[in-house]
Amino acid sequence: MLDLKRIRTDFDSVAEKLATRGVDAATLSQMKTIDKERRDLLVKVEELKAERNTVSAEIAQAKRNKENTDDKIAAMQKLSAEVKNLDASLAELDAKLTEFTTTLPNIPHDSVPVGADENENVEVRRWGTPHQFDFEAKAHWDLGEDLDILDWERGAKVTGARFLFYKGLGARLERAIYNFMLDEHGKEGYTEVITPYMVNHDSMFGTGQYPKFKEDTFELSDTNFVLIPTAEVPLTNYYRDEILDGKELPIYFTAMSPSFRSEAGSAGRDTRGLIRLHQFHKVEMVKFAKPEESYEELEKMTANAENILQKLNLPYRVVALCTGDMGFSAAKTYDLEVWIPAQNTYREISSCSNTEDFQARRAQIRYRDEADGKVKLLHTLNGSGLAVGRTVAAILENYQNEDGSVTIPEVLRPYMGGLEVIAPK
C-alpha cells in the first residue's frame, strides 16, 4: 500500500513513476482531490467537536448556577447532528481512499528499467552454456510419461486439467529437489518453516493479493480461508501487526509448500507439462530487513536462488523486470530463467523481489530502530528458491540421454539413495 503522505508531497514524481506501471495520472489526481476533501472535512469536524465540548462545559456551568440551559442544549444537539453527518461523509471518503490505496501498485525503484511488457525486460547476466544435443531433445512431459514417473492422464481424470501424479522415481526426484533446496538455504541462514496451507483474507490483503487479484485464487466457500498461492503469504504475515526489535533484523525464512493458483487468463498457455499448473510445490524465501539494507538483501536473495541452479548445473539467465512486467507489490524484481532445451528458450524458474514498505504498510509490520528508538516500517522481500516442478522439468530436459534415460545431477544423488540414472523400464 502506498504512503499517502508521499503522494501529497511528491505528487508529480509519484504520478510519473506509476504511469510507467499503467496508472493513469487522472486516477492519482482524483485520489489527491478526495484526500484533500477528507483532510478539510476532518478539520471542520474537529472544530465542531471543540465547539460542542465548549457548549457542553457551558451547560454544566449553567446548571451549577441554576440557569436556563434550553438554548445551549439545543445548540449542542445541533452540533452533534452536524458532527454525525460529517462523520458519515468522512467514512465515505475513507472508503474511497482505501479503494485507491489498496489497488494502486508499488512505486518502482529508480533502477528499474522502464518498459511496457516482458519484451522490454533487461538481461543482467547469464550462467552456463545451453547443452547442444546430438539427438532430438524430448520435452519433459514426454520424458516423464516414457519413464513412467509423471502421469497427467490420471491427474486429469482424478481432478482436471493442469493436475498430475508424480510416481515412483518422479516423486522421489521432486522430494530430493526440495530437500536439497531447503538444506542449501539453511546453510545461508534461513530458518526453515512449515506454514499453514490456508490463510485468512487479512493475510491475503497483507501481501497484496487481495482485493485486486481474488480471481487468481482458490477460496474455500463459506469460510474466511484461502488456499495459499505461495508460501510468501503465510511467511510474510507471520509478523503481521507486530513490532520487531531492530537488532533482530534481517530475518530470513524459507519454506516448501504447495501453491494453488487458478491461472485465470492463462487459457491456451503451457497446456502441457510442468510449467503452469493449478497445484505445484515451491520453495520460498522471505526476508524482513531495515530499509537501508533491503537492496543489498535483494542481491543476496537472488544469489541464493542462483546458487541452487549453479549446483544443479542448469544454464540460466538473470533478467531485471521492467516497470510494466513487475508484480503488483514489487518495487524491483529479478527473474531467473532456466534453459529448457525442447523449447529452445529460457523460462522463469524464480522471481526475487523487494517490496520495500508496500507489504509492511498493508500488514503493519514494523520495527523499533535501536539508533533512535522510533517505530518504523521495515522492508519485506520474497523470492522463489526455486519452483520445484519447473526444476523437475529443467532437469529432465537438460540431463536427458539419447536412450531416453535421465542422469541424476550429482548433488541430488545423496537424496536418492545414490541413484545415478532414471532409465526406461
UniProtKB/Swiss-Prot annotation:
Query: Which keywords does this Swiss-Prot/TrEMBL entry list?
Result: Aminoacyl-tRNA synthetase, ATP-binding, Cytoplasm, Ligase, Nucleotide-binding, Protein biosynthesis
Highest rank taxon of the organism: Bacteria
Catalytic activity of the protein: tRNA(Ser) + L-serine + ATP = L-seryl-tRNA(Ser) + AMP + diphosphate + H(+); tRNA(Sec) + L-serine + ATP = L-seryl-tRNA(Sec) + AMP + diphosphate + H(+)
Q: Which GO terms describe its molecular function?
A: ATP binding; catalytic activity, acting on a protein; serine-tRNA ligase activity; transferase activity
Signal sequence bounds = none
SUPFAM superfamilies, alphabetically? Class II aaRS and biotin synthetases (SSF55681), tRNA-binding arm (SSF46589)
The record's listing under Pfam families reads: Seryl_tRNA_N, tRNA-synt_2b
Pathway assigned in UniProt: Aminoacyl-tRNA biosynthesis; selenocysteinyl-tRNA(Sec) biosynthesis; L-seryl-tRNA(Sec) from L-serine and tRNA(Sec): step 1/1
Q: What are the annotated GO cellular component locations?
A: cytoplasm
Function of the molecule: Catalyzes the attachment of serine to tRNA(Ser). Is also able to aminoacylate tRNA(Sec) with serine, to form the misacylated tRNA L-seryl-tRNA(Sec), which will be further converted into selenocysteinyl-tRNA(Sec).
Q: Please give the HAMAP family that the UniProt record associates with this protein.
A: Ser_tRNA_synth_type1 (MF_00176)
Summarize subunit and interaction data from the UniProt record for this chain. Homodimer. The tRNA molecule binds across the dimer.
List the NCBIfam families: serS (TIGR00414)
- Print the domain comment field: Consists of two distinct domains, a catalytic core and a N-terminal extension that is involved in tRNA binding.
What family classification does the UniProt entry report for this protein?
Belongs to the class-II aminoacyl-tRNA synthetase family. Type-1 seryl-tRNA synthetase subfamily.
Query: Which protein are we looking at?
Result: Serine--tRNA ligase
Q: What is the lineage of its organism?
A: Bacteria, Bacillati, Bacillota, Bacilli, Lactobacillales
- This chain is encoded by the gene named serS
